[in-house]
Amino acid sequence: MERKASVTRTTKETDIAITLNLDGSGKADLSTGIGFFDHMLDGFARHGFFDLDCAVKGDLQVDGHHTVEDTGIVLGEAIKKAVGDKKGINRYGYFILPMDEVLALCAVDLSGRPYLNFECEFTVPKVGELDTELVKEFFYAVSYSAGMNLHIKMLSAGNNHHMIEAMFKAFAKALDLAVSYNPKVTGILSTKGSL
């Protein structure tokens, strides 16, 4: 059974439509209006082996905040919907990803309890047209709307482009592991019996 979800969200600030296939091949069709953000989402899809269609119209004449944050909200909702009842999946995933001088850690728990721990200090205000402070806002929105515990930590800092890209790719690899089926897991991986 294909684990796929489509979610739309329309406000006065943004109009977003996302389709996510957790069992895809890494194909992406992206249009957020922020080139560097599209590049990061493309890396997320490719390295997580997710198929991701993401069409966003946002109030970029104001700034990128609503576009990035609301995309995170909708992506998180799509992840939650696509994962479904969580039967038979690993639930946990982690990855440490190198990118040249940079080393990023990401750990995911699809617990149903939202939480973000984000440890990274950027040294420039923007990479391309993306405000670096919005990277944390994006992951916060994803974690809370997906109901996931998400830890992202920069173990070795360097070029800000590399840092952000390493985070998105580490998140992709960790999430791919968390949503993967494990033949040893019967039912839901929790002593409570539900997540």
Q: Residue ranges of each PLM-predicted region?
A:
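N-terminal intrinsically disordered, cationic/polar leader segments
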Residues: 1-195
